[in-house]
Amino acid sequence: MSSLHIFSDVLALSIAAFSALCVQAHLTKRFTPTFSKNLEEKLPQHNKAVFWWLGISDNALRYVFVSLNILVSVSLALADLRTTGLKVSMGLLFIGFYSDMKLGESPIPHLILCSVVGAAIVAR
């Protein structure tokens, strides 16, 4: 295993851990109160800006995000699915970036995560 592959695995596992943290933040405020509050406040805006065509409630969208974050965490944690998980992560981050741009919010968090995922993909 090359050092680039190990580097990619470390980045992928870091993204998996962050995705698991996002699941926790969507479900409870106990460990990440500020992050949870931010997600809770921004979710309705993102629902109206990007996901209006789904016609689902904010609460349902929250569980869609939780499910997607679980999918990403599991796929990045499993070595056989890691490449696919990175590609799915990149696609979801592009949607988040688009949503930020549409709402006039700072795209920096999604750009940083896109850079990390992109580096992991290139290093594979």
UniProtKB/Swiss-Prot annotation:
It comes from the Eukaryota. It is a multi-pass membrane protein. Residues 1-25 form the signal peptide. The keyword Transport does not apply. Keywords: Isomerase, Membrane, Signal, Transmembrane, Transmembrane helix, Virulence. The chain crosses the membrane at residues 61-81, 103-123. The keyword Cell membrane does not apply. One of its GO terms (cellular component) is membrane. One of its GO terms (molecular function) is isomerase activity. It is found in: Membrane. Its EC number is 5.-.-.-. Pathway: Mycotoxin biosynthesis. Belongs to the cyclic ether formation enzyme xenC family. Probbale cyclic ether formation enzyme; part of the gene scp cluster that mediates the biosynthesis of a hirsutellone-like compound that has still to be identified. This is Probbale cyclic ether formation enzyme scpZ. It comes from Mollisia scopiformis. The gene is scpZ.
